[in-house]
Amino acid sequence: MGQEQDIPWILSTGHISTQKGENGQQTPKLEHHNSTRLMGHCQKTMNRVVMPKQIVYWKQWLSLRNPTLVFLKTHALKRWRLFSKHEWTS
């Protein structure tokens, strides 16, 4: 699973198409740019806090159509609290 954390979220979604750049080269084009950027921000924040890999459930993130920053923060906090509570009791 260590290698999976190094893979950017945009590559794991399969929502990548291409667009031609100014020089005619094909470049990746994100289908859901805002949600991808928000997820990247949350992923970096969670990594800084050294949250265990169990906290991040990729399928949940991928199932979100238009996540808002408030929702993502709330969701991450709930997951962190549940994990912390579990760690203290075990």
UniProtKB/Swiss-Prot annotation:
It is found in: Host mitochondrion inner membrane; Host nucleus; Host cytoplasm, Host cytosol. The keyword Glycoprotein does not apply. GO terms for cellular component: host cell cytosol; host cell mitochondrial inner membrane; host cell nucleus; membrane. Signal peptide: none annotated. Residues 65-87 are annotated as: Mitochondrial targeting sequence. It holds the Pfam family PB1-F2. Residues 14-28 have a biased composition (Polar residues). InterPro entries: Flu_proapoptotic_PB1-F2 (IPR021045). Keywords: Apoptosis, Host cytoplasm, Host membrane, Host mitochondrion, Host mitochondrion inner membrane, Host nucleus, Host-virus interaction, Inhibition of host innate immune response by virus, Inhibition of host MAVS by virus, Inhibition of host RLR pathway by virus, Membrane, Modulation of host cell apoptosis by virus, Viral immunoevasion. Its main location: host cell. The record marks N66 as: Low pathogenicity. Residues 1-30 are annotated as: Disordered. One of its GO terms (biological process) is symbiont-mediated perturbation of host apoptosis. The keyword Ribosomal protein does not apply. Belongs to the influenza viruses PB1-F2 family. Plays an important role in promoting lung pathology in both primary viral infection and secondary bacterial infection. Promotes alteration of mitochondrial morphology, dissipation of mitochondrial membrane potential, and cell death. Alternatively, inhibits the production of interferon in the infected cell at the level of host mitochondrial antiviral signaling MAVS. Its level of expression differs greatly depending on which cell type is infected, in a manner that is independent of the levels of expression of other viral proteins. Monocytic cells are more affected than epithelial cells. Is not encoded in all strains, and seems to be dispensable for replication. Oligomer. Interacts with human SLC25A6/ANT3 and VDAC1. Interacts with host MAVS. This is Protein PB1-F2. It comes from Influenza A virus (strain A/USA:Huston/AA/1945 H1N1).
